Amino acid sequence: MMRIAKILSLAVGAIALCVTSAAAKKPIDIDAKMQEYGLVDIATIDASILVELKYAGTDNFVGSNMYGSLRKAYFRPEIARAIAAVQRELRRIDSHLSLIIYDAARPQSAQQQMWNVVKDTRYRRYVAKPNRGGHHNFGIAVDLSIARDGVPVDMGSDFDSFSEVSHIDNEASLLRRRLITREALDNRRLLRRLMRARGFSTYRREWWHFQQYDINYARRTFRLLDF
Protein backbone atom coordinates (compact mmCIF):
# COMPACT_ATOMS: atom_id res chain seq x y z
CA MET A 1 0.00 0.00 0.00
CA MET A 2 1.55 3.26 -1.08
CA ARG A 3 1.65 5.77 1.77
CA ILE A 4 1.72 9.55 1.48
CA ALA A 5 1.22 10.08 5.21
CA LYS A 6 4.73 11.42 5.76
CA ILE A 7 4.37 13.95 2.96
CA LEU A 8 0.98 15.02 4.23
CA SER A 9 1.56 14.73 7.97
CA LEU A 10 0.46 18.27 8.78
CA ALA A 11 -2.80 17.87 6.88
CA VAL A 12 -3.51 14.53 8.52
CA GLY A 13 -2.87 16.09 11.91
CA ALA A 14 -5.44 18.76 11.14
CA ILE A 15 -7.97 16.10 10.17
CA ALA A 16 -7.34 14.26 13.44
CA LEU A 17 -8.27 17.43 15.30
CA CYS A 18 -11.45 17.77 13.25
CA VAL A 19 -12.38 14.14 13.90
CA THR A 20 -11.80 14.61 17.63
CA SER A 21 -14.00 17.69 17.62
CA ALA A 22 -16.69 15.91 15.61
CA ALA A 23 -16.64 12.99 18.05
CA ALA A 24 -17.99 15.29 20.74
CA LYS A 25 -21.17 15.70 18.73
CA LYS A 26 -23.96 13.16 18.80
CA PRO A 27 -23.06 10.43 16.27
CA ILE A 28 -25.48 9.81 13.43
CA ASP A 29 -26.85 6.40 12.49
CA ILE A 30 -25.04 6.26 9.18
CA ASP A 31 -26.80 3.11 7.96
CA ALA A 32 -30.18 4.70 8.59
CA LYS A 33 -28.97 7.86 6.85
CA MET A 34 -27.88 5.94 3.76
CA GLN A 35 -31.28 4.25 3.56
CA GLU A 36 -33.03 7.58 4.11
CA TYR A 37 -31.23 8.83 0.99
CA GLY A 38 -32.56 5.90 -1.04
CA LEU A 39 -29.46 3.72 -1.07
CA VAL A 40 -29.29 -0.04 -0.53
CA ASP A 41 -26.73 -2.31 1.12
CA ILE A 42 -25.11 -4.50 -1.55
CA ALA A 43 -25.37 -7.49 0.81
CA THR A 44 -29.17 -7.37 0.53
CA ILE A 45 -28.79 -7.90 -3.22
CA ASP A 46 -25.91 -10.40 -3.19
CA ALA A 47 -24.36 -11.44 0.11
CA SER A 48 -21.53 -13.30 -1.64
CA ILE A 49 -19.80 -10.06 -2.65
CA LEU A 50 -16.88 -9.29 -0.36
CA VAL A 51 -16.79 -5.85 1.29
CA GLU A 52 -13.70 -4.27 2.82
CA LEU A 53 -14.27 -0.52 3.01
CA LYS A 54 -10.78 0.97 3.06
CA TYR A 55 -11.86 4.32 4.47
CA ALA A 56 -13.54 2.57 7.42
CA GLY A 57 -10.10 1.61 8.71
CA THR A 58 -6.55 2.91 8.56
CA ASP A 59 -5.35 1.07 5.41
CA ASN A 60 -5.84 4.10 3.15
CA PHE A 61 -3.88 7.10 1.92
CA VAL A 62 -4.99 9.26 4.85
CA GLY A 63 -4.13 6.60 7.43
CA SER A 64 -7.28 7.16 9.49
CA ASN A 65 -10.90 6.01 9.71
CA MET A 66 -13.09 8.50 7.84
CA TYR A 67 -16.29 6.42 7.88
CA GLY A 68 -16.85 5.94 11.59
CA SER A 69 -19.11 2.93 12.14
CA LEU A 70 -19.95 2.44 8.45
CA ARG A 71 -19.04 -1.08 7.32
CA LYS A 72 -21.60 -1.73 4.57
CA ALA A 73 -21.36 -0.85 0.88
CA TYR A 74 -24.32 1.30 -0.16
CA PHE A 75 -25.38 2.22 -3.70
CA ARG A 76 -28.34 3.45 -5.64
CA PRO A 77 -30.51 0.35 -6.25
CA GLU A 78 -29.77 0.09 -9.97
CA ILE A 79 -26.04 0.32 -9.33
CA ALA A 80 -26.23 -2.44 -6.71
CA ARG A 81 -28.13 -4.67 -9.15
CA ALA A 82 -25.54 -4.06 -11.87
CA ILE A 83 -22.69 -4.96 -9.52
CA ALA A 84 -24.53 -8.12 -8.47
CA ALA A 85 -24.88 -9.06 -12.14
CA VAL A 86 -21.11 -8.69 -12.56
CA GLN A 87 -20.62 -10.95 -9.54
CA ARG A 88 -22.82 -13.64 -11.09
CA GLU A 89 -20.87 -13.53 -14.34
CA LEU A 90 -17.54 -13.62 -12.51
CA ARG A 91 -18.63 -16.66 -10.48
CA ARG A 92 -19.83 -18.32 -13.68
CA ILE A 93 -16.34 -17.88 -15.15
CA ASP A 94 -14.67 -19.26 -12.01
CA SER A 95 -16.52 -20.19 -8.83
CA HIS A 96 -13.42 -19.34 -6.77
CA LEU A 97 -13.56 -15.69 -7.83
CA SER A 98 -15.50 -12.86 -6.21
CA LEU A 99 -15.73 -9.11 -6.38
CA ILE A 100 -14.27 -7.30 -3.38
CA ILE A 101 -15.54 -3.77 -2.77
CA TYR A 102 -13.15 -1.17 -1.34
CA ASP A 103 -15.40 1.89 -1.50
CA ALA A 104 -19.01 2.68 -2.29
CA ALA A 105 -21.32 5.57 -1.41
CA ARG A 106 -19.31 8.24 0.40
CA PRO A 107 -20.76 10.95 2.65
CA GLN A 108 -19.75 14.48 1.71
CA SER A 109 -18.12 14.93 5.12
CA ALA A 110 -15.63 12.17 4.29
CA GLN A 111 -15.03 13.73 0.87
CA GLN A 112 -14.15 16.99 2.60
CA GLN A 113 -11.64 15.21 4.82
CA MET A 114 -9.95 13.64 1.79
CA TRP A 115 -9.83 16.98 -0.01
CA ASN A 116 -8.32 18.70 3.02
CA VAL A 117 -5.44 16.22 2.86
CA VAL A 118 -4.64 16.54 -0.85
CA LYS A 119 -5.79 20.04 -1.87
CA ASP A 120 -2.33 21.60 -1.63
CA THR A 121 -0.45 18.63 -3.06
CA ARG A 122 0.11 17.00 -6.41
CA TYR A 123 -2.32 14.27 -5.37
CA ARG A 124 -5.36 16.57 -5.60
CA ARG A 125 -6.09 15.35 -9.13
CA TYR A 126 -7.09 11.98 -7.65
CA VAL A 127 -9.78 13.39 -5.33
CA ALA A 128 -12.99 15.15 -6.40
CA LYS A 129 -13.63 18.58 -4.90
CA PRO A 130 -16.31 18.27 -2.21
CA ASN A 131 -18.31 21.41 -2.96
CA ARG A 132 -20.55 19.82 -5.61
CA GLY A 133 -19.89 16.14 -5.05
CA GLY A 134 -18.42 13.39 -7.18
CA HIS A 135 -19.83 10.04 -8.26
CA HIS A 136 -19.20 8.39 -4.89
CA ASN A 137 -21.18 11.16 -3.17
CA PHE A 138 -24.31 10.15 -5.10
CA GLY A 139 -23.95 6.38 -4.63
CA ILE A 140 -23.20 5.77 -8.30
CA ALA A 141 -19.54 4.74 -8.15
CA VAL A 142 -17.66 1.75 -6.81
CA ASP A 143 -14.02 1.00 -6.11
CA LEU A 144 -13.42 -2.72 -6.33
CA SER A 145 -11.18 -5.58 -7.35
CA ILE A 146 -11.31 -9.34 -7.78
CA ALA A 147 -10.45 -11.87 -5.07
CA ARG A 148 -9.67 -15.57 -5.43
CA ASP A 149 -10.77 -17.60 -2.42
CA GLY A 150 -10.95 -14.35 -0.46
CA VAL A 151 -7.49 -13.09 -1.40
CA PRO A 152 -7.21 -10.09 -3.79
CA VAL A 153 -5.60 -11.01 -7.09
CA ASP A 154 -2.63 -9.15 -8.56
CA MET A 155 -3.72 -5.87 -10.17
CA GLY A 156 -0.26 -4.35 -10.45
CA SER A 157 -0.72 -1.84 -7.65
CA ASP A 158 -2.53 -1.47 -4.37
CA PHE A 159 -5.83 0.34 -4.07
CA ASP A 160 -5.25 4.10 -3.73
CA SER A 161 -1.75 3.87 -5.16
CA PHE A 162 -1.36 7.43 -6.40
CA SER A 163 1.09 6.59 -9.15
CA GLU A 164 1.38 5.90 -12.84
CA VAL A 165 1.12 2.17 -12.14
CA SER A 166 -2.56 2.55 -11.19
CA HIS A 167 -3.39 4.24 -14.53
CA ILE A 168 -5.19 2.29 -17.24
CA ASP A 169 -4.53 4.46 -20.29
CA ASN A 170 -1.04 3.15 -21.10
CA GLU A 171 -0.88 -0.34 -19.67
CA ALA A 172 1.11 -1.71 -22.60
CA SER A 173 3.92 0.63 -21.59
CA LEU A 174 3.61 -0.44 -17.95
CA LEU A 175 3.91 -4.06 -19.04
CA ARG A 176 6.84 -3.38 -21.35
CA ARG A 177 8.70 -1.60 -18.54
CA ARG A 178 7.84 -4.44 -16.15
CA LEU A 179 5.91 -2.15 -13.85
CA ILE A 180 3.01 -4.60 -13.99
CA THR A 181 2.87 -8.29 -14.88
CA ARG A 182 0.91 -9.98 -17.64
CA GLU A 183 -1.22 -11.58 -14.94
CA ALA A 184 -2.07 -8.18 -13.47
CA LEU A 185 -2.97 -6.82 -16.90
CA ASP A 186 -5.21 -9.81 -17.61
CA ASN A 187 -6.95 -9.35 -14.26
CA ARG A 188 -7.55 -5.67 -14.94
CA ARG A 189 -8.93 -6.43 -18.37
CA LEU A 190 -11.29 -9.08 -16.99
CA LEU A 191 -12.65 -6.67 -14.40
CA ARG A 192 -13.10 -3.90 -16.97
CA ARG A 193 -14.80 -6.19 -19.47
CA LEU A 194 -17.35 -7.40 -16.95
CA MET A 195 -18.03 -3.95 -15.50
CA ARG A 196 -18.37 -2.26 -18.88
CA ALA A 197 -20.80 -4.96 -19.99
CA ARG A 198 -23.11 -3.76 -17.19
CA GLY A 199 -22.91 -0.09 -18.10
CA PHE A 200 -20.00 1.09 -15.99
CA SER A 201 -17.37 3.50 -17.26
CA THR A 202 -13.77 3.76 -16.07
CA TYR A 203 -11.47 6.46 -14.71
CA ARG A 204 -8.11 6.48 -16.44
CA ARG A 205 -6.02 7.06 -13.31
CA GLU A 206 -7.55 4.30 -11.17
CA TRP A 207 -7.93 0.69 -12.31
CA TRP A 208 -10.31 0.06 -9.37
CA HIS A 209 -12.81 2.87 -10.05
CA PHE A 210 -16.06 2.39 -11.98
CA GLN A 211 -19.09 4.64 -12.26
CA GLN A 212 -22.40 5.17 -14.00
CA TYR A 213 -24.17 8.34 -15.15
CA ASP A 214 -22.71 11.65 -16.26
CA ILE A 215 -21.83 13.70 -13.18
CA ASN A 216 -23.85 16.72 -14.31
CA TYR A 217 -26.91 14.52 -14.80
CA ALA A 218 -26.32 13.02 -11.36
CA ARG A 219 -26.15 16.46 -9.76
CA ARG A 220 -29.45 17.45 -11.35
CA THR A 221 -31.21 14.16 -10.64
CA PHE A 222 -29.92 12.44 -7.51
CA ARG A 223 -29.62 13.46 -3.90
CA LEU A 224 -26.15 14.42 -2.69
CA LEU A 225 -25.04 12.58 0.44
CA ASP A 226 -24.69 15.88 2.27
CA PHE A 227 -23.99 14.55 5.74
Where are these regions (language model features)?
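Coiled-coil-like amphipathic alpha-helices with heptad-repeat character
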Residues: 1, 20-21
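Conserved metal-phosphate-binding beta-hairpin within the catalytic cores
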Residues: 210
